[in-house]
């Protein structure tokens, strides 16, 4: 069977190159039911990260975020260096209400590095 006729889950973890394929994801968004994308080096690429997320949100709703705790936060203005963002295509999302969640979610999110400090944050869609 032709996989391109199916709606699929796309998971991206390509160590900083994810920004280079955002246009491809948007161009092929109708073939993607769910998207899990790990954004790297966010502190260095803050504007690119924000722009990429805004563009993806035209077709996808954010349903979950997981912060990687490998690097401690330096100050209150610092943002996470690595975030895993889970999104669902707007056409199939039945729960289109505003999304707000405190993270981590108990029994769902676990630290990538258990000996490092936990990262707590809130997100509003």
Tell where the protein language model's regions lie, with residue ranges.
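Rossmann-like AdoMet/SAM-dependent catalytic core
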Residues: 1-6, 41-125
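Active-site segment flanking the S-adenosylmethionine/decSAM binding pocket
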Residues: 1-53
């Amino acid at each position: 069977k032709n996989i391109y006729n199916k709606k699929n889950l796309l998971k991206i973890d390509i160590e900083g190159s994810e920004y280079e394929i955002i246009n491809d994801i948007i161009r092929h968004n109708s073939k993607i039911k769910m998207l899990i994308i790990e954004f790297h080096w966010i502190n260095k690429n803050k504007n690119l990260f924000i722009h990429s997320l805004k563009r993806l949100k035209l077709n996808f709703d954010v349903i979950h975020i997981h912060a990687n705790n490998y690097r401690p936060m330096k100050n209150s203005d610092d943002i996470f260096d690595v975030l895993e963002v889970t999104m669902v295509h707007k056409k199939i999302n039945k729960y289109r209400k505003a999304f707000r969640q405190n993270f981590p979610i108990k029994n769902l999110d676990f630290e990538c590095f258990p000996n490092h400090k936990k990262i707590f944050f809130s997100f509003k869609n």
